[in-house]
Amino acid sequence: QIVLTQSPAIMSASPGQKVTMTCSASSSVSYMHWYQQKSGTSPKRWIYDTSKLASGXPARFSGSGSATSYSLTITSMQAEDAATYYCQQWSSNPLTFGAGTKLELKR
């Protein structure tokens, strides 16, 4: 199975700061998908097919990458962006998730 490694595991950012987190796949995948999860809630699809913004996801979010290297970027951190972000692939069975990047707000 394809192992997804997210980096960093935990990070903090101030309001307005640019944020980038990465997801590395153990083998090449066609697309990467990203989910946002806030404490006590179910994960929400945030970015799909590497770079397409899901419904409800703000335009300050973007995704990029190919093969084994993918990233999620927030151009300007907002308080509501504090959450855990998971990458996911289904190019190869079984579907797998990364362990997540926890993004905290630095005040």
Swiss-Prot record:
Q: Which parts of the sequence are annotated with region: Framework-1? A: 1-23
Under SMART domains, the record lists: IG, IGv
Disulfide pattern: C23-C87
Segments of this protein annotated with the region Framework-3: 56-87
Residues covered by region (Complementarity-determining-2): 49-55
Quote any Pfam family the record assigns.
Answer: V-set
Tell me the InterPro entries matching this sequence: Ig-like_dom, Ig-like_dom_sf, Ig-like_fold, Ig_sub, Ig_V-set, IgV_Light_Chain
- Region entry Framework-4: which residue ranges? 97-106
Question: Which region ranges are annotated with the description Complementarity-determining-1?
Answer: 24-33
Keywords (alphabetical) are:
Adaptive immunity, Disulfide bond, Hybridoma, Immunity, Immunoglobulin
User: Positions of the region Framework-2?
Assistant: 34-48
Q: Name one GO biological process term.
A: immune response
Give the residue ranges for region: Complementarity-determining-3: 88-96
GO CC annotations?
immunoglobulin complex
Known role: Anti-2-phenyl oxazolone (PHOX) Antibody.
Q: What is this protein called?
A: Ig kappa chain V-VI region NQ6-8.3.1
Q: Which species?
A: Mus musculus (Mouse)
